[in-house]
Amino acid sequence: MGMALGVAACGLAGCGDSELSAEELEDRVSEFSDASDRVDALDRTSSAVVEATPGAATYQGYTGLGNPDQGQSDVALVGETTLRVDFGADTISGRADDFIGTVDGGRTQEYDGSLVLSDGRLGVLTANSISAGMSGTLTGDGNTVELVDADLLGQFVGRSAQGLEMVDPDAVVRVNGDREDVSVAVIGER
């Protein structure tokens, strides 16, 4: 998981002309990287703990989109994410917005729009597993980035499910109508 998130952060750190201040971009990349490191450092939550967790919880975190197999990413975007997990109903929902990044080596700037989770389920593979679709449209710097196919799989981490991580290394976006393969990673902490 850390590698997928690192790709988007590296793509952002190497950007050139920017409509945002260097400090704003540095802060987002740092927050993203720090949250990723914290979640990656936690052990997998046991299925018994997830099954016994009552009620609902809100997780705050980040969603990153990037092209991990290229020297210079064509897409490198990071957004803030809010997720709601209902442990009783075995569902997860949420959205990512407030994206910052670059597309096709363009300027680093804010991207409007949001990406939304759909069909979010807990316990599909094991009691600890998470699955969800994600789609939506982001616009900025004259570009339209439409996430058309992301099937996220993940897990809870930490002794009391204080974190979660989901990834799709084979997601599809359309950038100004052209198909691009990207990796999508979602992390959250409560």
Task: Tell where the protein language model's regions lie, with residue ranges.
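Sec-dependent bacterial lipoprotein signal peptides
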Residues: 1-15
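Mature soluble binding/inhibitory domains
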Residues: 15-190
